[in-house]
Amino acid sequence: FSIPGHSFKRIQQKREQQLMNKNMAFFEERLNKLKSEYKTLVNRENEIIEPGNGIFNRYKYPVLTAKHTPLFWQYDLNPATNPYLMQRFGINAVFNAGAIKFNDKYIVIARVEGNDRKSFFAVAESDNGIDNFRFWDNPVTMPETGNPDTNVYDIRLTKHEDGWIYGVFCSERKDLSKPDDTTAAI
């Protein structure tokens, strides 16, 4: 049908453009909120819990959590492919890190567990080892063998006299004798 001076197609295009503008505004508002929350978290100063025991200090906040992972790990930040800015890769937890001081920075390689309960390692660093840890842009890339691991955890680090830093960790492989049991590992 048509309205004098207008075509249905033109009206439909105008509505689609209005919807795209509304979605873009929603996307930008949500992204700004996520960025603000992330910036507040990673810049937050940790606080000593007083009175302590006189030997070491405990701190109020954990140095790394799932919320410390970069937003671009968790979200597709492209409004064309993720207009509602939905989380695409859920992080369940960040924990059990190996740590070392290297080049005047405190470096941790943490176990990062996805919502699928599978883990990978990622490096984060801080100037003081107490707060302001930031993950490097990319997780650790692990070489695969002919018998691939399904999970990795419990990394520990040591600087060797040869100048390299070595990480020793545990890994799991699928127990092929139990193909229907997704929890079976060796």
Q: Which sequence ranges carry the predicted segments?
A:
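Beta-rich carbohydrate-recognition and catalytic domains
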Residues: 3-96, 100-150, 158-186
